[in-house]
């Protein structure tokens, strides 16, 4: 039986009633198969699963889609029930931010100003602030985050480590459609032509992976990804395409790396990333 709570007090009471380990999955709702994968991972690795559903206004810029962001709570609850979640915490904005905005924010550091942070100023301040708040409220043993939002995952791990938050952060691989498109709640905004164009993003990343598997160096991997993107259908406005190390530091010459991309397809912003293994240089 899944318990739905809307207030911090009711969440505290529900959390106190859980015995054994607790895993939390933080979402903004509009759940899809990618979220279901997170829920399954949490269910496998914890005795109890707490899901948070909260469209966080702090991580939306003035020209972004906060008001139109989908909020199908009944559908989300059914997914949580099927997944065996013990508690769903779905607060209203004033419940988490009674004064409208917090007076103390989490500063993500330099990495929070790069990539997504450069295109969306203040975004990761809002993300880390709400994540820390929800970690304090849910008191989990483990928290599960998708690798699709790889920069977010990396920053959450840094925050937990630097601030000594007693929780294990578990990254869960990206879930994709059969044609390779990374699952995202924002995919529902895409027109049929836009969805076809969006495949260029995952196609470019896979071209980079293939180039690396063939022995290409970092520059050639990026060139292969750019070439695949340029050869794709029109309608994709690239924001960034970068190759870094797994901690999002400047790209390595050899070994494990991360290839990340972001683009606009019409009015919809999409992000994606893949792991890349660069061949040793002799």
Swiss-Prot record:
It is an enzyme of class 6 (ligase). Its main location: cytoplasm. ATP binds at residues 28-35, 146-149, 175, 183-186. GO terms for cellular component: cytosol. Disulfide bonds: none annotated. It is found in: Cytoplasm. SUPFAM superfamilies: Nucleotidylyl transferase. Keywords: ATP-binding, Cytoplasm, Ligase, Nucleotide-binding, Pantothenate biosynthesis. Its EC number is 6.3.2.1. Beta-alanine binds at residue 59. Pathway: Cofactor biosynthesis; (R)-pantothenate biosynthesis; (R)-pantothenate from (R)-pantoate and beta-alanine: step 1/1. Belongs to the pantothenate synthetase family. Catalyzes the condensation of pantoate with beta-alanine in an ATP-dependent reaction via a pantoyl-adenylate intermediate. This is Pantothenate synthetase. The lineage of its organism: Bacteria, Bacillati, Actinomycetota, Actinomycetes, Micromonosporales.
